[in-house]
UniProtKB/Swiss-Prot annotation:
Family stated for the protein in its record: Belongs to the mannitol dehydrogenase family.
Protein source organism: Ralstonia nicotianae (strain ATCC BAA-1114 / GMI1000)
Annotated protein name in UniProt: D-arabinitol 4-dehydrogenase
Keywords from the UniProt entry: NAD, Oxidoreductase
One Gene Ontology molecular-function label: D-arabinitol 4-dehydrogenase activity
Pathway membership: Carbohydrate metabolism; D-arabinitol metabolism
Main EC class the enzyme belongs to: oxidoreductase
Catalytic activity annotation: D-arabinitol + NAD(+) = D-xylulose + NADH + H(+)
UniProt xrefs under SUPFAM superfamilies: 6-phosphogluconate dehydrogenase C-terminal domain-like, NAD(P)-binding Rossmann-fold domains
The gene coding this protein: dalD
Amino acid sequence: MTRSSLARAPVLLHIGAGSFHRAHQAWYLHRVNAAVPPGERWTLTVGNIRDDMHATLAALAAQQGAYTLETVTPQGERAYETIRSIARVLPWSADLAALINTGADPACRIVSFTVTEGGYYLDEHDRLDVTHPDLAADLRGARSTLYGALAALLAERRQRGAGPLTLQSCDNLRSNGARFRAGMRAFLALRGDAALLAWFDANVSCPSAMVDRITPRPTDDVRTRVHAATGVDDRCPVMGESFIQWVIEDNFIAGRPAWEIAGAEIVADVHPYEEAKIRILNATHSCIAWAGTLAGLTYIHEGMRDAAIYRFAYDYVTDDVIPCLTPSPLDLERYRDVVLERFGNPYVLDTNQRVAADGFSKIPGFIAPTLAECFARGADPVATAVLPALFLGFLEGWARGTLPYVYQDGVMDGAAARSIVEAPDSVAAFCSDRQLWGSLAGRDALVQAVRAGRARVEAWRAARR
């Protein structure tokens, strides 16, 4: 549903209207549009590739794209803001007709997307995993992955002569823009579509970005608080911490909103920022979630109150990550302290279940690089080795059915995971898994480090009993 007053404004199409997008990018655009003249505003259209967000999309559509964002500080101060940047909500269909039509319209200048690390289907060498059934189906013409959907969208855009387009990653994949571009090029080449590949090279930019705002899955409590504070019975409110950050590579081929007006940082090189965020925030978050689950805790902030879990996180960053990332344009010690303070926010109520998910993507993406760099410089990664050891213990709980919740992992091979934990030497089996470790798999240094980490984790667990 388009607001007529904004009908011909430049359009940003976002794929994935989940909580994070609505607490982050949509908030930025709302703030930008409020600060610029009407003629400089952009409109936001949202849709989805998969039919797994029907309730959210229906609620957004019923509210004309508007919804309430609740933010909360570590001190418990709550604020409420009605976000009005979404001008159109696309209905889902199996052929993605509305999504493709919108992205192929000349008014659309940016298509952005938020996917998990596994949603890129890339191995450690940035090669497409063509053995994955979804990707294999898309190579035959289906539209179930980001690549298949965007290939159809780009083909239609090229046919219409709709002009250049920016494809913008808004997620936690390291070097997301460059790696997505490599994946998209490989996908088109494997399809044998030389003409579309040439058009892509000449007409599409793919900026990298670092995004940050802790955004839990909404609960009914959020809706209740929103109603009490605003009087609005919002069917799709979203809640997040007060902290927000967005660092974007300045690489837009068809224009962009003035993101910096709302506080985004436009830079030539995102790499130092994303490395700090992925290793210090994302990996530490996973550490706390896995440890907290093993300790019988429910929320992230509870783990931060546990002296041993806090120490696991603090030592990992201080002893191993900061030396790996030095020198840096960031004050890494200060960043560490801010991150740990954010994790201790008891009002966000971020669950271990949410943060613990997708370990088979997080080990290679968030943790393995620090181990590899420690090995390369001759350092013993004592603190970092605790993190994969925690995940191995967590994986054993999953296999035995003792986790207190359903574990979600988009790329885990369940049979392979069970074979790891059932092996006579589960540490060696774990460290030999190439999906987790890539070129590190099977190395003696890795096995020894994780075995030592495992001993520390087991001693910690025994002391809690």
